[in-house]
Amino acid sequence: MDLTPREKDKLLIFTAGLVAERRLARGVKLNYPEAMAYISAALLEGARDGQTVAELMHYGTTLLTREQVMEGIPEMIPEIQVEATFPDGTKLVTVHQPIV
């Protein structure tokens, strides 16, 4: 399989997002990289499903709560930016204060 660097990045985010999803399902609080991967993967999948940038900006704030992450993680992630592929091209999705 010959993947571009961009495709490798997306695959890594998706894989880390799956690990985070499984840990959440077991009740394990997510650390920084897991929280980033979980939200980023969800945003990438949402773009692939046809959601708009505005919808994803809101959706990104509903994925995790303070109770689901380790102490101090919400303050470490003031925003998340993901370059996602939409039906009409690639766009930057920015989610401010993703963990409430």
Swiss-Prot record:
Domain of life the protein comes from: Bacteria
MF GO annotations: nickel cation binding; urease activity
EC number(s) stated in the UniProt entry for this protein: 3.5.1.5
InterPro entries: Urease_gamma, Urease_gamma/gamma-beta_su, Urease_gamma_sf, Urease_subunit
Keywords per UniProt: Cytoplasm, Hydrolase
Catalytic activity field: urea + 2 H2O + H(+) = hydrogencarbonate + 2 NH4(+)
Compartmental location: Cytoplasm
Primary site of residence: cytoplasm
Pfam families for this protein: Urease_gamma
Pathway given in the UniProt record: Nitrogen metabolism; urea degradation; CO(2) and NH(3) from urea (urease route): step 1/1
A single GO BP: urea catabolic process
GO cellular component: cytoplasm
Family from the record: Belongs to the urease gamma subunit family.
Subunit comment: Heterotrimer of UreA (gamma), UreB (beta) and UreC (alpha) subunits. Three heterotrimers associate to form the active enzyme.
HAMAP family xrefs: Urease_gamma
The protein, known as: Urease subunit gamma
Organism listed in the record: Pseudomonas fluorescens (strain Pf0-1)
